[in-house]
């Protein structure tokens, strides 16, 4: 189905808006994927805040012109699905996880932070934990020395207090027995 000029301009404007908000772009070749698998991929992407689009490559190139994703415009050939996400790792994770279970989805590359990513770069980006997990790990690291110190102090207090606290109990037990 061919698009007229106004429809093409609308698509370019929509994708330009996505690119302006997004931190990451991932591109994958989807040749041979069934409709059911593509529907699952789209559903997973939506639930993770990733916008997946099948676009004409010329429209995609025009849409990313002037953005940080322009550096990968030379990779925009063949039947591609484009994943944009505001979260730095979400698009890479969704596409890489799906590609593990469906060999027909082939990651072509992507862009993050104004830099082009090859296939391995996208996979490395996908392996990074989410922001929430990283913050939880950081908080755990910060709390670890404090909780360790508290446990040591409690053990010292228990050790010193054990002899003092047991003496009145023993004296009371002897008084009751006598």
UniProtKB/Swiss-Prot annotation:
Q: Which family does it belong to?
A: Belongs to the universal ribosomal protein uL10 family.
Out of the domains of life, which is the source?
Bacteria
Could you tell me which Gene3D superfamilies the record lists for this protein? 3.30.70.1730, 6.10.250.290
Q: Name one GO molecular function term.
A: structural constituent of ribosome
Listed name of the protein: Large ribosomal subunit protein uL10
Alphabetical keyword list: Ribonucleoprotein, Ribosomal protein, RNA-binding, rRNA-binding
Of the GO CC terms on this record, one is:
large ribosomal subunit
Which PANTHER family does the protein's record reference? 39S RIBOSOMAL PROTEIN L10, MITOCHONDRIAL
Q: How does it assemble?
A: Part of the ribosomal stalk of the 50S ribosomal subunit. The N-terminus interacts with L11 and the large rRNA to form the base of the stalk. The C-terminus forms an elongated spine to which L12 dimers bind in a sequential fashion forming a multimeric L10(L12)X complex.
Sum up the protein's function in the record's words: Forms part of the ribosomal stalk, playing a central role in the interaction of the ribosome with GTP-bound translation factors.
Q: Which InterPro entries match?
A: Ribosomal_uL10, Ribosomal_uL10-like_sf, Ribosomal_uL10_bac, Ribosomal_uL10_bac_type, Ribosomal_uL10_CS_bac
For the keyword Ribosomal protein, the answer is yes
Single biological process term from Gene Ontology: translation
């Amino acid at each position: 189905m061919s698009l007229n000029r106004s429809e093409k301009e609308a698509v370019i404007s929509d994708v330009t808006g996505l690119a302006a908000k997004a931190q990451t772009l991932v591109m994958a070749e989807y040749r041979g994927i069934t409709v059911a698998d593509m529907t699952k991929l789209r559903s997973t992407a939506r639930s993770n805040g990733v916008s997946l689009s099948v676009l004409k490559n010329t429209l995609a190139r025009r849409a990313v012109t002037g953005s940080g994703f322009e550096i990968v415009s030379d990779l925009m050939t063949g039947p591609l699905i484009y994943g944009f996400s505001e979260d730095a790792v979400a698009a890479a994770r969704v596409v890489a996880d799906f590609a593990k279970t469906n060999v027909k989805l082939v990651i072509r590359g992507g862009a993050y932070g104004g830099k082009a990513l090859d296939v391995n770069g996208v996979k490395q980006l996908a392996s990074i934990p989410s922001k929430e997990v990283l913050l939880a790990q950081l908080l755990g690291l910060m709390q670890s020395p404090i909780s360790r110190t508290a446990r040591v102090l409690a053990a010292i207090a228990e050790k010193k207090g054990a002899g003092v606290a047991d003496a009145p109990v023993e004296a009371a037990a002897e008084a009751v027995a006598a």
